[in-house]
Regions:
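Conserved "right-hand" nucleotidyltransferase catalytic core of DNA-directed polymerases
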Residues: 1-100, 147, 163, 171, ...
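Nucleic-acid-processing active sites and adjacent nucleic-acid-binding tracks
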Residues: 90-127
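Conserved beta-strand -> loop -> alpha-helix junction used to position metal-binding or nucleic-acid-contacting
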Residues: 145-161, 168, 175, 440-444
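Conserved catalytic core of nucleic-acid polymerases
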Residues: 194-197, 244, 251, 359, ...
């Protein structure tokens, strides 16, 4: 939840305080499925002759399914070299085809690709993988377009989102009671670490063939569990189609202005130096601002601007939340530290780091979209993470200006307007909100008029600002203290605002209470479309853990439903672009409620209409009909910064 909400600064302390989720699988996993065959390498084969591949192809065609797993020189699918391919169509029997090892026994890579192309592109044979999007990109770069893909990672995610992570090692332990051969065992660590291409073939065979074997076993289990849990539709409708769509978005990448980022780094460096001077002027001595220990000594011992506060480990408390509390009380020093941290992060994480992500071949940045990283179904991104670029500050907005359209093209931003508020109105059956959305009223002004008990025509900017904070705060389970800090009022006033809000919109309070009650009983919540988000700590004895999980449970159906709407929109748009043969217009990025497209300038008007039509039509889909309309804000520009 912290990661999804972009509360990244709290993530480390939350894990430290409460630990990682326990490893547990879906309830029907071991009770209703046959005992698995013992896992060993007895029938794992190393292919050292091109002709041997034929019988594996035949076996796959007869089975109608085959696990495909690639081994590579790196985890970057856009630059990695192919080292080998493993195949498995029968539990306990798998092979490994080495094509890029430093060994004379390797088979010619091009010959292997040519041999496997027919099978791997055959739509009548299922291609099963664990995070198969990675393998899709690797093989696509080698001239193979995988078809009919299945993904055990996504199957696990649909079944157990929020219960555990979904990487193969963990899934094997949970569902198969088997500890896999680790990647570290193959390549080592530290100074002794080698590339996978240097691993001995027999060892590589056991590792790669086991991966394929494990994947097939997991696939068989998850397929049955999806049926037992009645979750097949979530997997088939919302997960599988996104594999290829996101893969092509990643392959396309986005152009960034390297020189502009360089100038930003210079600008940020000057800001950092200026802030440091102001900090040292107050502290009356220089110190390492990045050191929590040294910073704590200044705050608590030298300046004495707060009573001594320490973490559980006994160190000085200098987290963002602590500094925000002190800044809220009027202290200048912690505010300067927060500003210094923000500018330093922008420089280190974005303006300095983004150029390092430019692919030397494509000259573009290729993020990785993560389908199974959140509890709610919301997408995430990494390497680089393009979903957490700050937008509230001017400096954060400047980072977005570095993302540009290529020559003779424009960027189009399509952003769902207040989608989570619309979904809340739909979920909780809030009559006043649904009416306001249907009449295209300003929802924040309406809320202000209700909670401040004034005519909507008399609502001023301050009223609206506070109402907006309450509206969005409710979605994320904001506390009265959190609201007080956000809108700069007393705790008492914040409590009164919340009480007034629930009095005017009682359906929302009913929704919140009933959602928590259901989650306490079942351990999960459902979104509008039926996806489950599990919350293991909803009944925890620790108040802080329980309270945090309750807020997350309230938010999950809202955020999850919004994510599903976005997934459906992406699927529709991909089909529409394909049907109309608009290959020159590309879907580049998905940033929460926003899609970014790169389109030819000549197609601007046509594409705006096409995008808007498809995204708004999701409101009346075969899977759910919303009682509130979905609206989309469209912006066009030469760079991402111009779109906001």
């Amino acid at each position: 939840f912290l990661r999804e909400m972009e509360f990244n600064r709290l993530l480390s302390s939350a894990i430290s305080a409460y630990g990682q989720p326990k490893l547990e699988g879906s309830k029907n996993d071991d009770q209703n499925l046959e005992k698995q065959q013992k896992i060993n390498n007895k029938n794992y084969y190393l292919i050292d002759d091109l002709g041997q591949i034929d019988k594996w192809i035949k076996e796959a065609e007869e089975a109608g399914e085959v696990v495909v797993d690639t081994e590579t020189t790196s985890l970057d699918p856009h630059q990695a070299d192919l080292v080998g391919i493993s195949l498995c169509s029968k539990i306990g029997k798998a092979c490994y085809i080495p094509v890029g090892h430093k060994s004379s026994k390797c088979i010619d890579k091009n010959a292997v690709i040519k041999k496997l192309k027919g099978l791997l592109e055959d739509p009548s044979v299922k291609k099963i993988g664990q995070n198969i999007k990675f393998d899709f990109i690797i093989l696509y770069r080698h001239g193979i377009t995988l078809s009919s893909m299945e993904d055990t990672m996504l199957m696990s995610y649909v079944l157990d989102a929020g219960k555990n992570r979904h990487n193969m090692d963990i899934l094997s332990e949970i569902h198969l009671d088997h500890k896999t051969i680790s990647f570290k065992e193959m390549v080592g660590t530290g100074k002794k670490e080698i590339n996978f291409s240097e691993v001995e073939l027999d060892k590589a065979k056991d590792y790669a063939a086991e991966d394929a074997d494990i994947t097939l076993r997991l696939y068989k289990k998850f397929l049955k569990n999806l049926k037992l849990e009645k979750m097949v539709n979530i997997y088939e409708i919302f997960e599988k189609p996104l594999i290829k769509i996101l893969a092509f978005m990643e392959i396309e990448g986005v152009e960034i202005d390297k020189m502009f980022l360089k100038s930003l780094s210079s600008k940020f460096e000057k800001k950092i130096k200026k802030l440091e001077k102001e900090v040292f002027k107050i502290s009356k001595k220089e110190f390492n601002i990045a050191s929590p220990k040294q910073l704590g000594e200044i705050i608590y011992n030298d300046l004495k601007i707060a009573g001594l506060k320490k973490t559980k480990k006994g160190s000085f408390a200098t987290s963002a939340s602590v500094l925000e509390d002190l800044a809220f009380k009027g202290h200048e020093f912690p505010k300067l530290i927060l500003d210094w941290r923000q500018v330093s992060k922008l420089k280190n994480t974005y303006s300095d780091a983004l150029p390092e992500h430019i692919n030397p071949n494509t000259k573009r940045v290729h993020t990785s979209f993560l389908l199974a990283a959140t509890t709610t179904g919301r997408l995430a991104s990494s390497d680089p993470n393009l979903q957490n670029i700050p937008i509230k500050s001017e400096d954060g907005k400047d980072i977005r200006k570095a993302f540009t359209a290529k020559k003779d093209h424009l960027l189009i931003s399509a952003d769902y307007n207040q989608i989570e508020m619309r979904i809340l109105a739909d979920l909780a059956e809030v009559k006043e909100l649904k009416k306001a959305f249907k009449n295209n009223e300003d929802i924040h002004s309406l809320t202000a008029s209700q909670i401040f008990n004034i005519d909507i025509k008399k609502v001023n900017q301050d009223h609206r600002r506070k109402a907006k904070a309450i509206n969005f705060g409710i979605i994320y389970g904001i506390s009265q203290y959190g609201l007080a800090k956000q809108i700069n009022v007393s705790n008492y006033e914040a409590e009164e605002f919340l009480n007034s809000y629930f009095a005017k919109f009682p359906e929302i309070k009913v929704y919140m209470d009933s959602t928590i009650k259901f989650c306490r009983k079942s351990g999960y919540v459902n979104n509008i479309f039926g996806r489950r988000s599990h919350f293991n700590g909803i009944n925890d004895k620790n108040f802080n853990v329980r309270n945090f999980q309750e807020r997350a449970a309230i938010n999950a159906p809202i955020q999850g439903s919004a994510s599903e709407v976005m997934r459906l929109a992406m699927i529709r748009l991909d089909k529409r672009l394909s049907d109309q043969n608009r290959s020159s217009s590309k879907m580049l990025l998905q940033i929460h409620d926003e899609l970014i497209f790169e389109v030819p300038k000549k197609d601007e008007k046509v594409m705006i209409k096409l995008i808007k039509d498809e995204m708004t039509s999701v409101a009346q889909s075969d899977y759910h009909s919303f009682s509130t309309p979905l609206t989309v804000d469209i912006n066009v520009g030469d760079n991402w910064g111009m779109l906001h």
